[in-house]
Design a protein with these regions (language model features):
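A structural signal for small-residue-enriched, beta-sheet-centric alpha/beta enzyme cores
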Residues: 2-107, 113-422
Length: 422
């Protein structure tokens, strides 16, 4: 399909995770955190059980809620099912907690299922916070009924606040579009979402938790395929500090409430392509927001790599630049030091010839044919005042390209993480 034309028909809307019809959410203070002013529990519930899919951390030290949610979606080889609710707590990761942690995650599903009136396997759970501390189940016994009573079609903003840890602000986004696809033409579909993430961010499916919703009718397996592809192109292109969390979770639900009589969208159809485009818009916005809100960050950094031998090498090269402390600190210092970009590219092991490499920083040519290009230092300093810094490197070795998002590295990152548990 012609996505350039389709892009015109997408519009941003308010509401985040509850922007799509058929969903309610709540964010409350449950007691996982000591500060009574801090929301720490989010509950997202469709009006009726609906198709759901999940993508989870690749960290082998994965947390109890990841293990339980993965199992409730049919295991690692499936990843989708019919879901009645999503429970997210902040302040405690329930990771490295053994059988006690697993029992807590399973009991959370049981409590939520009793409140909603569904099967425990229809509940997905996620946790974020400090690793290695036992998560008190009694807090869920009061939190879940309270959150259920607080559910609202306008509760997306509170839910987004409740899942924050070191985030400086909540993260939510939503779009609507008018379908032109056969069987769906004229239907208005909405995709919304919320996420959290600021540190321990290099998802490989950041700590990253995201919940995406749509009111389009989608076949469950198609929903998983769509989510898996989108996560690879968006959330997996974010790195704040090169650390992959124990708790990375991305969940998507499809209520079908905007077109109850329409046939479910299946993979390979025009309707699938439309929805995938809208989901990508939401997830890319959220992913960029995570990078921009990296712990201690003052700037979003976009790293574009072109001319790689293949997609894998493009990704390796872009991540090498994005994860380099020397690159990140020179950006924090407003220093157009392209030599650090060249260093990061050269050490990462991908195939290219030095004399074929070109590097631009903030649109300024600084390296051509592997050699320095004279540039105006004052103009570079002016451009580095921008809130987003763009680094572009052409390896001249092939046709593959990618984009990775990161942030600069400041003294504040050390302060935040040095004081994290205090």
């Amino acid at each position: 399909m012609n996505t350039e034309l389709f892009d015109i028909k997408i519009r941003a809307v308010e509401g985040g995770v509850t922007a799509a019809a058929g969903f309610k959410a709540a964010g409350i203070h449950a007691g996982f955190r000591k500060n009574p002013e801090r929301l720490d529990y989010a509950f997202v519930v469709p009006d009726k059980p609906c198709p759901g899919a999940g993508v989870f951390t690749t960290n082998r030290f994965c947390a109890a809620p990841v293990q339980v949610s993965r199992a409730n979606l049919g295991g690692a080889d499936k990843g989708y099912g019919i879901i009645a609710g999503v429970s997210v707590n902040s302040g405690n990761a329930n990771a490295a907690t053994g059988e006690t942690g697993l029992a807590c995650a399973r009991e959370t599903c049981s409590i939520a299922s009793q409140v909603i009136g569904c099967e425990p396997q229809q509940i997905l759970v996620a946790s974020t916070g400090v690793i290695g501390q036992i998560l008190p189940i009694d807090t869920f016994e009061t939190a879940i009924p309270a959150a259920y009573e607080a559910l609202s079609a306008h509760g997306g903003a509170d839910a987004a606040r409740a899942i924050m840890t070191t985030d400086t602000h909540s993260k939510e986004y939503a779009v609507s579009y008018v379908s032109e696809a056969a069987g769906h033409a004229g239907n208005v579909y909405t995709v919304g979402g919320m996420c959290k993430g600021s540190g321990m961010i290099m998802p490989n499916m950041a700590t990253m938790i995201a919940v995406i919703t749509t009111d389009a009718p989608v076949e469950p397996a198609a929903l998983h395929a769509l989510l898996l592809s989108t996560v690879k192109q968006t959330f997996n292109k974010v790195t704040v500090d090169s650390d992959t969390s124990t708790n990375d979770t991305c969940i998507m639900l499809a209520s079908g409430a905007a077109a109850a009589d329409a046939e479910p969208i299946v993979e390979g159809s025009d309707a699938f392509d439309e929805l995938a485009f809208a989901v990508h818009e939401v997830c890319e916005s959220l992913a960029r927001n995570i990078a921009a809100d990296g712990e201690g960050a003052s700037k979003l950094v976009t790293v574009n790599v072109t001319g790689a031998v293949n997609d894998e090498e493009a990704d390796i090269a872009a991540r090498a630049v994005a994860n380099s402390p020397l690159v990140k600190t020179c950006i924090a210092g407003h220093d157009c030091n392209w030599g650090r970009v060249a260093m990061a590219l050269g050490k990462c092991g991908v195939k290219f010839n030095q004399e074929d490499v070109s590097i631009d920083m903030m649109g300024m040519p600084v390296c051509r044919d592997g050699l320095t290009v004279p540039f105006d230092e004052d103009e570079a300093l002016r451009r580095f005042e921008a809130s987003e810094i763009v680094i572009s490197a052409d390896l001249g070795a092939g046709d593959a390209a990618t984009t990775v998002w990161t942030c600069d590295l400041t003294h504040e990152y050390i302060s935040i993480n040095g004081d994290y548990r205090s």
